[in-house]
Each structure stands twice: as C-alpha cells, then as structure tokens.
C-alpha cells in the first residue's frame, strides 16, 4: 500500500488510544498522514471471526482523529468509517476484500487507500457510494433468490391488469423469479459472447 512500516512517523505499531476511563489501550497499527492518525488497523488471527472485535475497534475509532478503520484477520479485510454519525464507527463495513477471492473491482477500490492516492475527503465519498451499492446488491440478491410480496407488486403494476391480491402475487412470484433469473443469464451470455 506504499506506507513505510519502518518509519514510525508513518506506521505506528501498538498505537496507544486512551478510551474514556480505559487508559493505554492499543490499536495494532495506526497509519499517520500529515502527522495525524488517518487509518487504524486491528489485526487478528486468521482463525478468529472478525465480528467479535467490532466493539473494540469502535472504541479506538471514537477516541482518535482517524477517519478510517480496518479490521482484518489477514485474509478478510473490512473497511469502516463514520458515515452514519460523526466520530462513531458504522456497524457495518463499507467495503470488504477477501484475499482468497479477489475481484478486479475490489482491487480498484483498494488502490484508493494507497499512500500516493490517499485523499480522506474523496475516500469518504467513495465509502458512501460503496456502502449503499453494497446494500443494493444484497437486497437485489435476496430478491432474486426469494422475492418478497412488495417486489412482486412492483412488477405486477406494469404487467397485470387485475388487482394485486395475495393470490395474484403468489401466482406471479415463480414467473417473475424465473424471468429475472433468465434475464440475468441472458445478459451474462451476451457479455461472454462479446468477449469471445
């Protein structure tokens, strides 16, 4: 990522963070930019589930001027910031990268954290976009697997002349689900054909 781990003014291991009445707590690493902590990194064992440490990172984040925090087990990296409320770490990461299954789009986003590219303000905007795009993909994935009634109603208003009763919703649910999945398959096939 371009940060000099041997420069104590740039990467500080075991950075001391005084949190309320708890003095001397330490975050594993703090990356400093212009003399201020910009990114906090809490590193855990690759065997540890990351969810158990979110509260710890939350405390560290609120006690510093850092705008970004990373929770990692060396395989999965979760990136956090304070989009919902200033100085309070969001509950969910705005970005995740899994080194065992890296996607090109994730690499492009990760490069924005490189020392030469780091810009806290623009990264904050990127974080907001990533957070909401991630949520849209989660919702869309869930709807494609098992569409809820409101999702079916959305289509019914344009394709069905009758009233959207529960029976109509139940009748159209498998049709709409199948059509959406066929549409996605067709789009993927077209992309593959164009690539060949």
Go through each PLM region and give its residues.
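A short, conserved, highly charged catalytic patch centered on acidic carboxylates
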Residues: 1-68, 79-196
């Amino acid at each position: 990522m371009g940060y000099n781990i041997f420069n104590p003014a740039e990467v500080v291991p075991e950075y001391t963070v005084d949190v309320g009445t708890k003095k001397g707590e330490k975050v594993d690493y703090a990356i400093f930019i212009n003399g201020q902590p910009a990114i906090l990194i809490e590193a855990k064992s690759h065997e540890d589930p990351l969810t158990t440490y979110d509260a710890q990172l939350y405390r560290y984040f609120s006690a510093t001027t850092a705008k970004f925090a990373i929770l990692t087990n060396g395989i999965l990296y979760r990136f956090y910031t304070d989009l919902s409320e200033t100085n309070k770490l969001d509950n969910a990461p705005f970005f995740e990268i899994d080194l065992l299954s890296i996607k090109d789009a994730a690499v492009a986003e990760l490069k924005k954290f490189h020392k030469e590219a780091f810009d806290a303000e623009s990264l904050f905007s990127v974080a907001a976009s990533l957070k909401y795009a991630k949520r849209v993909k989660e919702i869309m994935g869930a709807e494609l697997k098992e569409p809820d009634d409101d999702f079916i109603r959305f289509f019914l208003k344009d394709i069905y002349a009758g009233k959207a009763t529960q029976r109509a919703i139940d009748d159209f649910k498998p049709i709409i689900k199948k059509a959406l999945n066929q549409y996605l398959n067709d789009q993927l096939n077209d992309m593959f054909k164009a690539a060949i």
